[in-house]
């Protein structure tokens, strides 16, 4: 069976016969852009970003069009595909921030999100990441909401980015178990993971602040720092 991620949907094709046959199609919700999928032990995991746009609170005078307020959110869909011709949604998870990267290792899914901190009209609510976890069942959907408080925020030394790096860890064998969540002041685009540890790579720019006799180009050194987390 082939699972093909396309623009707007996922096509499931049976290739066991002489002629391939489309047996199911999973359509995406409005505003959701899938970017990655995993297949593990009868489960299909679809990861993507959903843009949240909000209308202006009040009418403004004619002027240059402002950037519309938007809050990127990462959404993960978990499907039961033990019967590929009838995929069944069993869980939906949504969290603040843009999806950066993920790794699947030994039945666990590890993920990194980046949440920009908007300094304009900043509030405590806008800084702290929030999450919504929905479990589907025949008896109805169970929705739980959670977040990460200021007392749980961590930071990387010498961080200057106004950004939160959020790490998520899902146990794919226990769909009812809440994911492990952490948030760090800083940002990263590279993640390495195995069954025992996760390594995050961060770019660092070291500027030369020595006084110059005239106007010169700024001098800096670019390095990469690695941080290892035990899983």
Describe every region a protein language model picked out.
Residues 1-231:
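Beta-sheet-rich non-transmembrane sensory/scaffold domains
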